[in-house]
Amino acid sequence: MRIKIISDLHQEFGISDIDFGNADLVILAGDTNLGTKGIDWVKDNIRDKPVIYILGNHEYYKGAYPKTLDQIIKASLHSNIIVLEDKMIEFEGIRFHGATLWTDFSLFGSPVEYGIICQAQMNDYRQIRKTPSYSRLRSIDTYKIHQASKRWLQQSLEESNGYKNIVITHHAPSIKSIPEEHKNEPISSAYASNLEDVILKYQPDYWFHGHIHTPVRYHIGKTEIICNPHGYINEEYNGYDIDLIIEI
């Protein structure tokens, strides 16, 4: 199977031409576009192969959690798009486990302290509401979502022993994904969590993620972690590999 992995297209700022022709499966690891616009784009541009679609934080901008998630799932029905949010799908003998994931704000210490810092600095907590109250999303909310997703993922991997397993999240599972120049910044705890113990326990074959606009590729044990972000259309070239295909 030939898998094309991309994240962070950020089409709300402009759309790039991408060739998906030589892939058997496309994985979009979050921040494709706002709301259901990314789903509409996939329907128009990637019609001949399955697409696994993960929500990033930006899908929720100008929307609400979980209302936007429900809208995206509904928009994907009866199409070639599989939305994974705390959900696993088996395809040609490979199990794909997907979630936005968010973070636990615990990279550097107290999740309360760093949650407060990140809530003040991240646009997520100004741009996203929560339903049914329509009050602003808070760091405690995404912390709770992260904990639920982590529990689900551990259970899903536990039940998938003996299979080839690929985990797909928007947020990163290790500080190793953070560029060196940002590794000690408090706000980095809104980009990654330390899930290396989970990786080492279950050793999925791959963990694909996005959110961080710098490509990375490294191993934790036998698991290869890959981030291949396109980034904003007006950003300086970040090393994104337009031709990256993972063959399994």
Task: Describe each model-derived feature in a short phrase.
Residues 1-54, 59-68, 130-135, 139:
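N-terminal active-site segment of His-dependent metallophosphoesterases
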Residues 1-4, 88-98, 219-224:
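Beta-strand-turn-beta hairpins that frame and shape the catalytic cleft
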Residues 5-7, 26-31, 52-57, 82-86, ...:
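Active-site neighborhood of phospho(di)ester-bond hydrolases with catalytic His/Asp-centered motifs
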Residues 10-16, 33-37, 58-68, 88-90, ...:
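Active-site environment of divalent metal-dependent phosphoester hydrolases
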Residues 53-59, 64-125:
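A basic- and aromatic-enriched beta-loop-alpha substructure that forms the phosphate/nucleotide-
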Residues 76-81, 152-164, 198-207:
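A structural motif corresponding to the C-terminal end of an alpha-helix
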Residues 79, 179, 185-205, 212-248:
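Binuclear metal-dependent phosphoesterase catalytic core
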Residues 97-166, 171-182:
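Active-site-proximal loop/helix segment associated with metal-binding centers of metalloenzymes
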